[in-house]
């Protein structure tokens, strides 16, 4: 960035996407301030790194700053945004600041409706073990780092590319990964899946002539846009037509392994501690990126062997009296199906008890029919009220109605508990040794699993 930019203020700094950028900027020597509605481990970490963190949004939070960065959850009526505009301080979206960081390095951007965080984390781990030492900005906490960001000394920056509002088009990566393309964020993409596909084509074609696109051939929508891709690309998947493919897949407990091939050549076995066939595809994308950067396959294997997973991605929170509590961020029907399938394939003999909190009224409305039929791998399903994420309620769109329709479509054991805070006591009454309890959703449902663990420990003691 131009040398006169020294002080940067983040509105909503505690968000997972904002905090990573703020941490990298702090490590680069910029003065960073920010505000958020509440204190968290994330805000505490940023404060310990030298960030000036305020709680609540107020015009007084905007001290002597050169630029204001906002998340997608922050609107024009925010008092800090209004004050910045009054003082003619530039107000930019998070993606634009990420684009500035990416201009300092060769960017590797991981895009797609699902799997971005896990794939980004895998790429970051593989490149680190390959000696590349990338700068990392992830939408989840990488367990081996204990954070979602790191300033590396190498030439590359690995980051998620958020398609939710089209702002990933501000990025200009050298390597672009697209894991899949699905219908989501339909409040923004009013043209539906065709508009979403068009936007991804634009994103892919932004890479330079010497860059590379890494594209999942298993995804129907990606396969459909391949003729429109104008830049060099490789494909990955399970099909023999994919450039990089997996065979001999094994899913055992929390471990996944497979044999990786490149254009017919057998490279070797990869194993990592994260369940689910969908994570095989994420791992193949990682291998494609690492191979493009000439990381030896042995070091790629080592990176996977030491991959510690990602916070809120099938994260085992604890086990008490034979009851395992797992948390996952999945909130789209496709993600839910994949996550439940991972649980069933890894532990076929264990009962899967799912506590689901729908995320956003708009998503629940647009994808209602898909939500109704995506829970069949759950032996027991409990729904709680929709996490609004700042949205106004939509008439007729409720978790209770969703639960009723899930039951009508053949799900046998479905319960609706309106108050999320009542869930731990309800779960305590129904769980038994051998169960896997999965809290599922992008809101605050993770607190339910932690509360249940405390109650189980008390009951055991």
Curated annotation (Swiss-Prot):
Q: What is the predominant subcellular site recorded for this chain?
A: cytoplasm
Q: Which Gene Ontology CC terms are recorded?
A: cytoplasm
Organism classification: Bacteria, Pseudomonadati, Thermodesulfobacteriota, Desulfuromonadia, Geobacterales
Catalytic activity, reaction form? UDP-N-acetyl-alpha-D-muramate + L-alanine + ATP = UDP-N-acetyl-alpha-D-muramoyl-L-alanine + ADP + phosphate + H(+)
Write down the superkingdom of origin: Bacteria
Pathway entry? Cell wall biogenesis; peptidoglycan biosynthesis
Q: What job does the chain carry out?
A: Cell wall formation.
Q: Name one GO biological process term.
A: cell division
Keywords annotated in UniProt: ATP-binding, Cell cycle, Cell division, Cell shape, Cell wall biogenesis/degradation, Cytoplasm, Ligase, Nucleotide-binding, Peptidoglycan synthesis
Q: Which family does the record assign?
A: Belongs to the MurCDEF family.
> For this protein, what is the EC number?
6.3.2.8
User: Which gene name does the record give?
Assistant: murC
Which species?
Answer: Geobacter metallireducens (strain ATCC 53774 / DSM 7210 / GS-15)
Give an example GO molecular function: ATP binding
Q: Which residues bind ATP?
A: 112-118
Output the HAMAP family linked to this UniProt entry: MurC
Q: What is this protein called?
A: UDP-N-acetylmuramate--L-alanine ligase
Q: Where in the cell is it found?
A: Cytoplasm
Carries keyword Aminoacyl-tRNA synthetase? no
Q: Is Cell cycle among the key words of this record?
A: yes
**InterPro entries, sorted:** Mur-like_cat_sf, Mur_ligase_C, Mur_ligase_C_dom_sf, Mur_ligase_cen, Mur_ligase_N, MurCDEF_pg_biosynth, UDP-N-AcMur_Ala_ligase_MurC
